[in-house]
């Protein structure tokens, strides 16, 4: 049985992804008691898996270069970073949406002046406003993008919205939803050939659990 290496996104998706693997019979004891470890081994008669936890943007890099065979990552990351791999499944966890938000008194769709948009996702934002025929200046923000309209850095933001509570607390409103997003399973193209039996088994079993 060939070892399958799986890169999991740290944080928001981690716990729910581990639950899915537990439900298909993977031993997740090391993942549940991880301490400061970076790599976690899981082997039984059904699976031989090596997990590692990385930040979301790095999951695609690990899979793209073949350091990981499978990755679990949000669709938001996939939309922002185009790589060469298979996107095989919607895991239906980590559900949220991309949205445009601003202060209630600002109408970003009126007037001909170039609007300033703050976002962690410039590629997603650029495509959205281009399709609307609106000229924008994109400002890349790594921290709390909600701050940008409040302090006058930007007219609006494009960001992930889960419940909307953070926006409300900061006096912002959603003016339009862009698209729904959730966690996806991605697979390295070469690994799909060289470890076809092992990876196909994981995909089939996860699909059964997710769509049950």
Curated annotation (Swiss-Prot):
Pathway(s) where this gene product acts: Amino-acid biosynthesis; L-histidine biosynthesis; L-histidine from 5-phospho-alpha-D-ribose 1-diphosphate: step 1/9
Pfam families linked to this entry: HisG
UniProt superkingdom: Bacteria
Catalytic activity, EC: 2.4.2.17
Listed GO CC annotations: cytoplasm
Class of the enzyme per the UniProt entry, highest EC level: transferase
Protein's cellular compartments: Cytoplasm
Catalytic reactions on record: 1-(5-phospho-beta-D-ribosyl)-ATP + diphosphate = 5-phospho-alpha-D-ribose 1-diphosphate + ATP
Keywords: Amino-acid biosynthesis, ATP-binding, Cytoplasm, Glycosyltransferase, Histidine biosynthesis, Nucleotide-binding, Transferase
GO terms classed as biological process: L-histidine biosynthetic process
UniProt GO MF annotations: ATP binding; ATP phosphoribosyltransferase activity
PANTHER family noted in UniProt: ATP PHOSPHORIBOSYLTRANSFERASE (PTHR21403:SF8), ATP PHOSPHORIBOSYLTRANSFERASE ATP-PRTASE (PTHR21403)
Biological function: Catalyzes the condensation of ATP and 5-phosphoribose 1-diphosphate to form N'-(5'-phosphoribosyl)-ATP (PR-ATP). Has a crucial role in the pathway because the rate of histidine biosynthesis seems to be controlled primarily by regulation of HisG enzymatic activity.
HAMAP family found in the cross-reference section: HisG_Short
Entry text on domains: Lacks the C-terminal regulatory region which is replaced by HisZ.
Subunit composition and interactions: Heteromultimer composed of HisG and HisZ subunits.
Record-stated family: Belongs to the ATP phosphoribosyltransferase family. Short subfamily.
Protein name (record): ATP phosphoribosyltransferase
Source organism: Clostridium novyi (strain NT)
Gene field: hisG
